Amino acid sequence: MARRPRRSDSSSAEPTLSPQHLLALVRSTIPPIHPAGRPFIAAGLAVAGVGYRHRWARRTGLLAAGACAGFFRHPPRVPPSRAGAIVAPADGVICVIDTAAPPAELSMGDAPLPRVSIFLSVFDAHVQRAPVSGEVVAVQHRPGRFGSADLPAASDDNERNSVRIRTANGAEVVAVQVAGLVARRIVCDAHVGDKLAIGDTYGLIRFGSRLDTYLPPGTEPVVRVGQRTIAGETILADLP
């Protein structure tokens, strides 16, 4: 009579979950938080801690902390390896594809350039990433209004911060952070002379808004209005 083969002692041992492996699983599942979001998360946790005896205060604090953790998430991204690619500088939905003069404060002239605008909702990741590899040759902040960022006039009227990047081949791409109705705080960590790699994080807009990308003359966008973008990964166009 045939017998079922027995497993050896070494193979019958149950796999163990070490603390290091558990930590690696958590890190791969939960994206890190951008440093700018930590004070907001801490404030929510503080409210929950101070009011832990009151259910409404505890829940409100925990919900606020969780929402801020989602808003300020900083997920890892893998930029394309294709030479000459221009990637989306922000998560969101493409709301405008047109031609427009670059921001006047950059002194690049008034000749229209191809422009791709991305609208960020409060549910999108707030961080912005370099659309190309190159050197930061100009950073200019301009005060303005805080109108709804999905309106066409937002690019001209709202507060904005422009970063001009020059690639190794001399092509220039401009990424403009535009404030909005809810987003009233632009953070830019890029400075003139910095060398950025495509997909590097250089700033954020608190609680959504808009990102305008001005492309070199002759560039043809390969995206469409209404398309969702992933910062650092979605290709907007190729350098001419």
UniProtKB/Swiss-Prot annotation:
Q: Where does this protein chiefly localize?
A: membrane
Catalytic EC class: lyase
> What InterPro entries does this protein map onto?
PS_Dcarbxylase, PSD-A
Record keywords, A-Z = Cell membrane, Decarboxylase, Lipid biosynthesis, Lipid metabolism, Lyase, Membrane, Phospholipid biosynthesis, Phospholipid metabolism, Pyruvate, Zymogen
Named in its record, the pathway it takes part in is: Phospholipid metabolism; phosphatidylethanolamine biosynthesis; phosphatidylethanolamine from CDP-diacylglycerol: step 2/2
Q: Look up the record and report any one GO term of the cellular component aspect.
A: plasma membrane
> Could you tell me the superkingdom of the organism this chain comes from?
Bacteria
What membrane topology does the annotation report for this chain?
A: Peripheral membrane protein
Q: Which residues form the active site?
A: S209
Q: After translation, how is this protein modified?
A: Is synthesized initially as an inactive proenzyme. Formation of the active enzyme involves a self-maturation process in which the active site pyruvoyl group is generated from an internal serine residue via an autocatalytic post-translational modification. Two non-identical subunits are generated from the proenzyme in this reaction, and the pyruvate is formed at the N-terminus of the alpha chain, which is derived from the carboxyl end of the proenzyme.
Task: Give EC number(s), comma-separated.
Answer: 4.1.1.65
Q: Is Ribonucleoprotein a UniProt keyword of this protein?
A: no
Catalytic activity entry: a 1,2-diacyl-sn-glycero-3-phospho-L-serine + H(+) = a 1,2-diacyl-sn-glycero-3-phosphoethanolamine + CO2
Q: Which residues carry this modification: Pyruvic acid (Ser)?
A: S209
Q: Name one Pfam family in it.
A: PS_Dcarbxylase
List this protein's GO terms for biological process. phosphatidylethanolamine biosynthetic process
Q: Where in the cell is it found?
A: Cell membrane
Instruction: State its cofactor.
Output: pyruvate
Site described as Cleavage (non-hydrolytic), positions?
A: G208, S209
Q: How does it assemble?
A: Heterodimer of a large membrane-associated beta subunit and a small pyruvoyl-containing alpha subunit.
Chain's role: Catalyzes the formation of phosphatidylethanolamine (PtdEtn) from phosphatidylserine (PtdSer).
Q: Which family does it belong to?
A: Belongs to the phosphatidylserine decarboxylase family. PSD-A subfamily.
By its UniProt entry, which NCBIfam families does this protein fall under? PRK05305.1-3
Spell out the protein name for this chain: Phosphatidylserine decarboxylase proenzyme
